[in-house]
């Protein structure tokens, strides 16, 4: 089979490369595969998490130099230039603008995305078989899984034990703030997403917004991500450098990211949060909550205070756990995991030959930068090189 050949017959397809997921990492990898002559079959809803799980009024923390193109041609800056947009006029970058860039990038790359969902992936007879929600079946010689963060939300146990469905939500499912106008809301968490959601609620005239967190209030100052460029270049030239560091050295890299991403809040939030309705509760956590007969939620804080709110929002982040990715259930026995993360080689290949995992789940082996869009071009380059090797071994590039 030619590496650029996708065959379709009677609801079944055969492809050298199946890419599961059409977010930034999936699109970046598929585009680069196509550039080197491997025609990928991409399954997913393009930028679905960004469209459906990020509020329309959200802004990105990145600059205009972060993009998806491993070839460095169809960059975000190129998109702005073609659209006649001055980068200074979109700083910070609205999330909807970056989604439009991703659509532009997909079109430039000539990527056709099958708007379906993979329900099950199996590995019979040395190849992969994917069953889609539509019933369609795909046979592939190699697979790139780009699951994003959808499946990896962190949920405190007390929430489900104490509150009925509908009385609480995670930030990723809280995108329509109109229904919270005039409401009393508790946000659990004290990093960027917590304070940005607080600002969005304040913009929507929520009656009370309480932000509770265990640590000091982060500093409102712009993050400096310039140091990431050197780390990306290092990863491109020496893919295994991060995993080969001593534990203390890896921790030092992680602390640098923590300092920029977690100990700082974007200064453009300051004015939006400077309202009587916004209350900060540092050095505190929830020790109990219960629903009241009048419909309120009584929340007890560790500092002795009690609050009554109408809704609880969890800004509690994400943690990779590949056992939570539904379509991987059929191949989990073949995947080596470390604390939920996939164990990957220097080309993002898992312990199951031919199955690659990119994006957020790769952060344990490649570093925290692969939880950011900035890692897309390097991840695409390394992954596609690995895919080429896998296809060579199976004879699919003959």
Task: Please place each PLM-identified region on the residue numbering.
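Flavin (primarily FAD) cofactor-binding/catalytic cores of flavoenzymes
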Residues: 2-47, 90-203, 208-398
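Flavin (FAD/FMN) cofactor-binding and adjacent substrate-gating region
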Residues: 51-84, 229-249
